[in-house]
C-alpha cells in the first residue's frame, strides 16, 4: 500500500477531528458535518452539507465522496451524486450533497459522520478516433444483455 501526503486546511466552521480511517484496512475516511445549525433533510429532498475542510490533492489524484452504508441502510440517506468527485485543482470547502430516500425526515447534526472520502489515482486518456472497433463476444449488448 502506498501512502501519499495530502494537505488539509481546517476552515472557520471546522468541528472535531480531521478525517480518519476507522480501521486498519478502511479504504475511506469519514467526513464530519460542520454545519452551524441542525439541517433538516425532508423525505425526497437534497441538502448540501459543509465539512469545514479543504484539501490540496497531488496531480493525478481525485477524492471520491461516497455514502456511509449505515446511514443508507438505517435511514435512506445517501450521496446524491455518488460518487462525488473532488478534482486535484479544487481548493474550496468539501461539501456533501445528501439526499433522503427514506420514509422519515432526517436531521444532520454538527459532528455527525455523513459520508466517506476515498483518495484515488486516475489516468488521463488520449482519444484515438477510429471508424472500427475490435469485435468482442458481447458486442453492442447493453443493459441486461449478460443476464440478470
UniProtKB/Swiss-Prot annotation:
Q: Which cofactor does it need?
A: Mg(2+)
Coiled-coil positions = none
Recite the UniProt keywords alphabetically. Answer: Hydrolase, Magnesium, Metal-binding, Nucleotide metabolism
Keyword Cell inner membrane recorded = no
Annotated catalysed reactions = dUTP + H2O = dUMP + diphosphate + H(+)
Entry EC number(s): 3.6.1.23
**Matching InterPro entries, A to Z?**
dUTPase, dUTPase-like, dUTPase-like_sf, dUTPase_trimeric
Q: What class of enzyme is it?
A: hydrolase
Cite the GO molecular-function annotations of the record.
dUTP diphosphatase activity; magnesium ion binding
GO biological process terms, semicolon-separated: dUMP biosynthetic process; dUTP catabolic process
Q: Which top-rank group of organisms is this from? A: Bacteria
Q: Which residues bind substrate?
A: 68-70, 81, 85-87, 95
Q: What family does the database annotate?
A: Belongs to the dUTPase family.
Protein name (database record): Deoxyuridine 5'-triphosphate nucleotidohydrolase
Q: Which organism is it from?
A: Rickettsia typhi (strain ATCC VR-144 / Wilmington)
At the highest ranks, the source species' classification is: Bacteria, Pseudomonadati, Pseudomonadota, Alphaproteobacteria, Rickettsiales
Amino acid at each position: 500500500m502506498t501512502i501519499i501526503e495530502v494537505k488539509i486546511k481546517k476552515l472557520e466552521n471546522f468541528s472535531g477531528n480531521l478525517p480518519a480511517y476507522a480501521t486498519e484496512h478502511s479504504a475511506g475516511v469519514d467526513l464530519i458535518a460542520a454545519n452551524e445549525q441542525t439541517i433538516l433533510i425532508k423525505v425526497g429532498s437534497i441538502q448540501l452539507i459543509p465539512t469545514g475542510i479543504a484539501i490540496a490533492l497531488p496531480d493525478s489524484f481525485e477524492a471520491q465522496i461516497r455514502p456511509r452504508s449505515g446511514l443508507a441502510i438505517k435511514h435512506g440517506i445517501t450521496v446524491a451524486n455518488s460518487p462525488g468527485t473532488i478534482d486535484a485543482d479544487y481548493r474550496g470547502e468539501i461539501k456533501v450533497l445528501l439526499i433522503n430516500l427514506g420514509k422519515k425526515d432526517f436531521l444532520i447534526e454538527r459532528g455527525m459522520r455523513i459520508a466517506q472520502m476515498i483518495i484515488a489515482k486516475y489516468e488521463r486518456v488520449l482519444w484515438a478516433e477510429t471508424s472500427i472497433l475490435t469485435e468482442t463476444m458481447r458486442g453492442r449488448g447493453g443493459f441486461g444483455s449478460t443476464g440478470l
